[in-house]
């Protein structure tokens, strides 16, 4: 979760009232923030936020804005925002190359003038930039931001897809490097180049004199892209891959600059070719948020309250949220700097915070029930105890993984596996149908530890339901364990299996397994009353090599659900 350090005097100046540290701690509570200490030497307050949905609070100006609104009823007005059908006068243009639509499509900006930046303001701006890009911007992948002295920039600015061989002097260096060299040599290139390095061309910002402004989202130009104490005219741009996230980040920063005392001058972004949007140009900062409907009955039902519409609207106003009624329906208008109202429930949460948690009295539950462990969980715990008693160490794994680990390395078919239709990353593309790949992956990184290794997991697996005409899935609880060492053989694991089922008081039958990941003749399927419930055996050298394992391994896996139902 985001942690920020803000100068206490700057913060209290914006709030407009002095508070002790303990009072500040109380002021932060409604906004899911915790007072984490005060450094007398630096004069900074340390604050930790327990929510990532409100990036507008991660600066001293944004936090002061919310506190003034909540406790003193001061809702700010930001009249520099454009709206649909009402674009403000623009003071510069950003021209977007149509090739950027497949790389990093969105860029928006504004100019800020009229205030001299001092050292503490600059430090606060840089910290906010970092927090915004790291947390809300997902380490610059989703959103990245740049700040520049606008006196060195000639508009219009071009946002182009450039050759990786294009050279300029990056910030913090005194020699020219190509974009490829920046990726490989510059600290920021090493940290962030993975975001764009798979593309044939890279994003570049050029002014009208063809000077490089920045290489987003990696690094600014050394000649133009550094903000200094004493600067008064600033250009701010935000690039990103998500339209609304990019716009919101720019809106939040614009409101912060305005609250500091700057004049905000809008900048127009011109898309030379539509990017699947319903416009070809946009004057920013731009208000894009949609109104959200709410129902008074739903508010009172979820909160267990009896609030009137008027009281609800007052509570929302304390959160900086305006509301109105039309045709017997009620709507909230999200503030310029917020986009966290996805559902009526989000509105109700703001009503609750606006009312104050102390105004809601605790009640005993009206329903009474006695809880207990399910039979499956009790049986699973017995199995865990047996495994620990036999010298195994319990592991806990993620249920999702890659095709490479679950299927390719195991040399098996993907017939039983569930695949995510739109995965964020290939590392979490499939839901596991077996625990064995997880155990082997652990073993592959454990060669430095003394042998033998004995690990197990009791966990969920999911299989396609192949026995019906309707698509579906079956979820089971499985036990799997792995033994590795120079002396580990089929006889060793067979002895452990026999001991396990002896203490479970279950009789099983064994038949030779045809699974590809076992050595021929050294794998067995486990049958209980003619039903196959699992298997065990020695892993083949081919599979071991796929995982980078160079020591013999034997594995076991059984379906606990079937074990219970058939025993």
Curated annotation (Swiss-Prot):
One of its GO terms (molecular function) is magnesium ion binding. Mg(2+) binds at residues 340, 346, 349-350. Keywords: Aminoacyl-tRNA synthetase, ATP-binding, Cytoplasm, Ligase, Magnesium, Metal-binding, Nucleotide-binding, Protein biosynthesis. SMART domains: B3_4 (SM00873), B5 (SM00874). The keyword Metal-binding applies. Its cofactor is Mg(2+). Residues 287-362 form the B5 domain. Its EC number is 6.1.1.20. Pfam families: B5, PhetRS_B1, tRNA_synthFbeta. It catalyses: tRNA(Phe) + L-phenylalanine + ATP = L-phenylalanyl-tRNA(Phe) + AMP + diphosphate + H(+). GO terms for cellular component: phenylalanine-tRNA ligase complex. One of its GO terms (biological process) is phenylalanyl-tRNA aminoacylation. InterPro entries: aa-tRNA-synth_II/BPL/LPL, B3/B4_tRNA-bd, DNA-bd_dom_put_sf, Phe-tRNA-ligase_IIc_bsu, Phe-tRNA-synth_IIc_bsu_arc_euk, Phe-tRNA_synthase-like_B3/B4, Phe_tRNA_ligase_beta2_arc, PheRS_beta_core. PROSITE patterns: B5 (PS51483). It comes from the Bacteria. The keyword Metal-binding applies. Belongs to the phenylalanyl-tRNA synthetase beta subunit family. Type 2 subfamily. Tetramer of two alpha and two beta subunits. This is Phenylalanine--tRNA ligase beta subunit. It comes from Borreliella afzelii (strain PKo). The lineage of its organism: Bacteria, Pseudomonadati, Spirochaetota, Spirochaetia, Spirochaetales. The gene is pheT.
